C-alpha cells in the first residue's frame, strides 16, 4: 500500500473510531459506573445503544466535523486568493455555523461550511455550556471570557493533525512540530481559556501526527517515546508561560503511562486519572486506554467509556488515537460495536458525512486561483469549500 492510500485509511480510521467511541459513550455519559453495571452487566456497555437503527453521535463529533470543515475552507480560501490566515484561524467561523445549528440564531446570516446546509446536523446532543457560551461571544464578535479547562476543546482538535498528515503523505510542506502544537492550542483556546483546557490539545495533536505514519507494530513499541517527544515540544513552547500547568500535565501523563503497565483493572486505573470532565483528565484517560489496550481498538474504547465521568469525550479521544493506529479498513471489517449483520457505515449516524470529511482531509486542496475546475473532483471541491454546498452528500 502506498503512503497516500495508507494515510487516507488512517485518517478515516481516526475520525470513524472517534465517532464510534463518542456514540458508545454518549449512551452512558451522565451515569456513573455502578449504574452502567446495573444496566449492561459488570463489563459495562460493549455495544452501541441504538435509536431506531442508528448509534447516535454527540456534540463531540459534531464539533469535530465543523473543525475539519473550517480548516478545509481555510486552506481553500488561501489557495483561491493567494493570501490568507493559517487554517486553524478559520475554525471560528465554522463554530458560528455549528452554533447556528444548535440555536438557529438569526444574527448568523453567512454560512462558512457546507455542513450547515445538512438538516441532519441540527440535532441537539447535549452541547457543552462552555462551548455554547463561547460561540455566543464569537457571534457577537467578542472574545470569549472564561477560565474553563473542560474537555470541549480537546475533543474536537484531531482534524488539524489529520489535515497535516494528508499534506505530508503527498510530500507537501505543512507544519513543523511547534506550529502543529500551536495550531492545536489555537483551536481549543478559542472556547476554553484555562491552560489545562488547551495544552492537552497540543499533546493530542502532536501524538496523532506522529503515530499516523507508523505501523501498528511500530506504535506499540514506540508510543511512550512518542509521548515523551510530545511533552518535550509542549514544554519548550509553553513551559515558561504556563510552568505549573505544564509540570502538572507532564506528571499526569506519566501517571497514565505507569498505570497502563500496572495490574490494576481499567476502572481502578482510570480512577487515579480523574473522570474526564476536564481536558487534562480526558487526555490521560484516553492515553491510558490506548496504551494498555494497544492491540485492540474495541477493548481500548470500551475501557475509555466505562467509568464515572465524561464517557463520550474519553471514548472519542481514545478512538482518535486507536483509529489512527489501526485504520478504517480494520474497524470496518470488525463492525465494531455493531449488531450482528450490520456494518459500521450502516449503524453509525452521519457515517457518510464523516467519511466525506475524512477523505477531504486526506486529499489536500484540489484547486487554486488559476484552476479551470476541469474535473468532477475539482468541481465538487469548489462547491463544498467555496460555495458551501453539501455536494455528494445525501440530505436527510
Predicted features by range, described:
Residues 1-396:
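Structured, active/binding-site neighborhoods that engage oxygen-rich ligands
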Amino acid at each position: 500500500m502506498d503512503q497516500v492510500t495508507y494515510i487516507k485509511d488512517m485518517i478515516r480510521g481516526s475520525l470513524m473510531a472517534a465517532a464510534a467511541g463518542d456514540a458508545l459513550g454518549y449512551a452512558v455519559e451522565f451515569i456513573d459506573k455502578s449504574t452502567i453495571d446495573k444496566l449492561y452487566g459488570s463489563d459495562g456497555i460493549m455495544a452501541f445503544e441504538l435509536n431506531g437503527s442508528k448509534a447516535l453521535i454527540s456534540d463531540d463529533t459534531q464539533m469535530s466535523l465543523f473543525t475539519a470543515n473550517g480548516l478545509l475552507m481555510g486552506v481553500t480560501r488561501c489557495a483561491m486568493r493567494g493570501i490568507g490566515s493559517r487554517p486553524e484561524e478559520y475554525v471560528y467561523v465554522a463554530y458560528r455555523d455549528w452554533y447556528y445549528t444548535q440555536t438557529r440564531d438569526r444574527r448568523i446570516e453567512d454560512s462558512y461550511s457546507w455542513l450547515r446546509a445538512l438538516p441532519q446536523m441540527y440535532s441537539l446532543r447535549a452541547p457543552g455550556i462552555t462551548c455554547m457560551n463561547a460561540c455566543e461571544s464569537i457571534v457577537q464578535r467578542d472574545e470569549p471570557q472564561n477560565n474553563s479547562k473542560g474537555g470541549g476543546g480537546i475533543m474536537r482538535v484531531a482534524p488539524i493533525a489529520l489535515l497535516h498528515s494528508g499534506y505530508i503523505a503527498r510530500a507537501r510542506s505543512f507544519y513543523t512540530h511547534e506550529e502543529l502544537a500551536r495550531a492545536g492550542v489555537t483551536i481549543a483556546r478559542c472556547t476554553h481559556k484555562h491552560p489545562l483546557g488547551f495544552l492537552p490539545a497540543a499533546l493530542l495533536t502532536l501524538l496523532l501526527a506522529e503515530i499516523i505514519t507508523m505501523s501498528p507494530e511500530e506504535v506499540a513499541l514506540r508510543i511512550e517515546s512518542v509521548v515523551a517527544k510530545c511533552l518535550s515540544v509542549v514544554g519548550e513552547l509553553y513551559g515558561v508561560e504556563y510552568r505549573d500547568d505544564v509540570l502538572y500535565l507532564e506528571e499526569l501523563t506519566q501517571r497514565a503511562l505507569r498505570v497502563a503497565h500496572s495490574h490494576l483493572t481499567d476502572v481502578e486505573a482510570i480512577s487515579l486519572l480523574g473522570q474526564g470532565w476536564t481536558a487534562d483528565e480526558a487526555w490521560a484517560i484516553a492515553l491510558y486506554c490506548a496504551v494498555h489496550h494497544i492491540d485492540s481498538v474495541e477493548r481500548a474504547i470500551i475501557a475509555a467509556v466505562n467509568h464515572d465521568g465524561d464517557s463520550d469525550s474519553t471514548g472519542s479521544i481514545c478512538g482518535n488515537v486507536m483509529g489512527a493506529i489501526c485504520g478504517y479498513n480494520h474497524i470496518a471489517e470488525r463492525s465494531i460495536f455493531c449488531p450482528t449483520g450490520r456494518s459500521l457505515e450502516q449503524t453509525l449516524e452521519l457515517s457518510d458525512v464523516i467519511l466525506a470529511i475524512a477523505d477531504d482531509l486526506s486529499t489536500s486542496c484540489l484547486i487554486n486561483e488559476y484552476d479551470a475546475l476541469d474535473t468532477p473532483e475539482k468541481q465538487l471541491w469548489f462547491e463544498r469549500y467555496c460555495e458551501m454546498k453539501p455536494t455528494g452528500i445525501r440530505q436527510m
